[in-house]
């Protein structure tokens, strides 16, 4: 999971999130305002309600299409995928200030798609516990140090300076492979 995108992988690739909800927010607000001004029970209100529903469905379809394409790309490319199990619903409710962004990127749906596509292809989908300190462990020397969410660069005493999400991705991959060997 990447807070300002969809994911960061252990190869250094970062997949941004297209933010479909954010892009349609102004138009949605305008349509909802128009809907609120219509008289209840009228044909014009029903038409306005359908316009709002159509835009919401379009936004959801855009997100699903993007997630299907990304999950298919990953499922075709890799034999083993290791992910961190995160509770995105709680992440969006805890007041981190990015609730809409967390829900807009569709990480939970993405993981579900990835899981069934990998299992259909006979590949491995490994879940690493959300309490595993992936961003706090140095991917080079293995030492652990506390960092805050504001720290975007992980700096270790061994001299390693690395993006926090990339460091976490490498650690999640290593832990996932360890879990796979243990199973």
Functional labels for PLM-detected ranges:
Residues 1-183:
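Positively charged, helix-rich recognition surfaces that bind polyanionic ligands
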